[in-house]
Amino acid sequence: MRSVELIESWPVENVGTAVVSSDGQVVASHGDLERVFPLASVSKLLTAYAALVAVEEGAVGLDDPAGPEGATIRHLLAHTAGYDFSERTVRAAPGDRRIYSNVGFEVLAETIAERSGIDFASYAHEAVLVPLAMTSTDVSGSPAAGASSTVMDLARFAAELQRPTLLHPETVAEAASVVFPGLDGVVPGFGRQRPNDWGLGFEIRDGKSPHWTGAQSSPRTFGHFGQSGTFLWVDPEAQLACVALSDRDFGPWAAEVWPTFTDAVLAEHRR
């Protein structure tokens, strides 16, 4: 795919990308594939996946109480527990608003650690990184934004998201479906979205505009982007996933080039 070469025009020093088909094959890649990049909020995808493993293993349940009074694991994953973005203050009743929250993911990890008896970084490492051979990925930092990884490690994770081996496919399908539909909210860097649909840790594109995915991305596209200049999306209708990691913080440059890049990848794939 020649479209991956578009990253050469991005105003960044180091960048890499990989495109992964639904059968788990890396069909195209370009740039710094083994460089370790900070993931920022793309970390939430790994945290959410480990949390879902904990659910399937019975360490926690999606409807177990967690966080503010009346909130559950499900609320924390879907950014509807009512927490502020960065402070442990409650701004809304559970389920009333979609407030994107790093704190919610920190509380999620603390809850799983408490109930499993294993610190969350170790749990995530053994539950996700080891079986997927993500040997260059580190999840010892903040579960909301502190992981680091490589393009090729995240390509393995993108393959897992499309053809799950660690979770039942039904669990991943639920995670990639809207939870608490109809709630408005803000996608950082892209403003208020009505509605701001989210799954169990996965942001869902639906009809959001503007957005970090492409105009040609299907409404079912899910994934996450990070303020460190990173993203991972899965488009179930295109049967394709894409990872891009860079070393320049998100800003207007990314809001401009990422959608164009995604549309080019999808267009070439569909030809």
Question: For the regions a protein language model found, what residue spans apply to each?
Answer:
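A short, well-structured edge-of-sheet supersecondary motif
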Residues: 2-34, 39, 78, 203, ...
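Glycosyltransferase-associated regions of secretory-pathway enzymes
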Residues: 19-21, 62-66, 201, 211, ...
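Active-site helix/loop module of the DD-peptidase/beta-lactamase fold
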Residues: 38-42, 46, 54-90, 94, ...
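Active-site-proximal alpha-helical segments within enzyme catalytic domains
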Residues: 45, 104-111, 145-167, 174, ...
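Penicillin-recognizing serine hydrolase domain
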Residues: 132-133, 153-156, 160-194
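Active-site Gly/Thr loop motif
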Residues: 142-145, 151, 177-237, 271
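Structured C-terminal helix/loop/strand segments within mature extracytoplasmic catalytic/sensor domains
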Residues: 221-271
